[in-house]
Amino acid sequence: MDKELFFGVDVSKKTLDLAYYDGEAIDWKNAHIQVSNDDAGFKKIGSWVAKVGKDFDTFLFCMEYTGLYNQNFRLWLESKEYIYGMVEPRKMHRFEPDLDDDQRSLDRIKTDELDAFRIAIYCEQNHKKILRNPSKLPSPVYFKLKRLLAERKQNTKQSVLYKQQLHDICAYDTDLSVE
């Protein structure tokens, strides 16, 4: 049987907070790292995962949908062939992990670090569902098409503005020539 390690990732514009959970106990002191949300931070994550995950067979990363903020991290995960799942923020907001009384309560305190732990625990409790349908970024063609459609929309708006200006100028010139 594979020994799995579950990583919760709280993504923000500038930083990534990662926490891991092995399904047994939470190591509040050593199971968290905060890095920058860029290539230098991803390199630190790679070193940290290799260090903390040396006794594990598989890794599963989970994070909330945050739009563009997690796109580069997702590209990095896919380049390293890590499996990851995307979680709806509403599900995470309602998720309350079952913890022992002596452990810190995750439902009362709101920090990026605790959010990462909460996501890691969610990842462990839902790993079979996530593994059945892991997340993948769409193909590069999708992003190119999306950019082209946005450009087309912008050009259409600009064209309408120019036509309106031309109409206003023609109407103004006609009004003056009649007088």
Predicted regions span which residues?
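Phosphate- and other anionic-substrate recognition elements at nucleic-acid/protein interfaces
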Residues: M1-E179
